[in-house]
């Protein structure tokens, strides 16, 4: 099929795919915080919902349709971020995402060189929400609030504020402690509180946006508080480390789902140091995936084979139960501790190793075990010897020669 514009064709195809789903879809835009809000919402919602989200920071004209294409029959909530760098870009992203819930994170300096004013940029971003049912935003940001009032949005305003009580979500107090921030709030006349394991202002604003979405979706304050307290920091990119025995480690031990696995495997294959070296995958059970395990891990096995993985190490009871699906060189362990005790990690040599696991499996200890240790070196300087050396060389100079240090 030949098309005039491959980009427009891709967007149109994703738009039609999106129209097949009648589920809550959260569209997230703003100058900063889009990926953090999306990933935190995933952490908050995924224990009880099948959530489809943008991989990493896929928020561009190409990234958005690729993200929306991941919606499938089992999807119950969609989380997609949209980023623009110049006027005229948001209409296409709105048509693809078609958000029912909008989140505007903040208005900052990013890409300001392509706009005549902050207000122009804000109005352009708000086009994402023209058909949304609900819009979450910070009422205390006067520029954003003013633009929202002038925008084409006709739905429910879910503003939050630390200053005004007449908003849907009033932040009554914020208490910053040594390693956490306690947020007390009033929603629908009821007082509640939650804490986040961060103390910076950006994390506070991002967490309140997540709080608003969860409240709108009907999550109880008690459930929100329990999940907010264990929010994990967002790893913005895959971490590459030098490993022992000539290995290269790709650490993605922050989350585990099918789509992010595909992206991580693609990343591994594109690395120039992968050529001619064995590709090894250490994977944990995929949690909160829903559906039959045989179907899920059958898809995983086919993906792993297609991506050229030559050695597979599976960790978890679910993977151990379906090990017959994996045809390449493979071994399986019911827990991370069992893998560590097996000694198999010490047999890996000159391989590119992708470490991909759900947080509960503590795969960070595997990365620590496999990483090349860097030992501290202490340099001691004998200043008396330095002075002696200086005086020695000065003795060869003429008396009128000056020195500069």
Describe every region a protein language model picked out.
Residues 253, 278-351:
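C-terminal helical cap/extension that packs against the catalytic core
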Residues 1, 101-248, 270, 276-277, ...:
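Acidic, Mg2+-coordinating active-site environments of NTP-dependent enzymes
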Residues 2, 7-139, 145-156, 346, ...:
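Phosphate-binding loop of NTP-binding sites
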Residues 84-87, 108-110, 141-142, 255-256, ...:
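Short glycine-rich anion-binding loops that position phosphate/pyrophosphate groups of nucleotides
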Residues 28, 235-239, 261, 265, ...:
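ATP-dependent carboxylate/acyl-activation modules
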Residues 351-352, 362-405:
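A charged N-terminal "starter" segment
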Residues 112-117, 261, 290-294, 364-365:
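Glycine/threonine-rich flexible loop motifs
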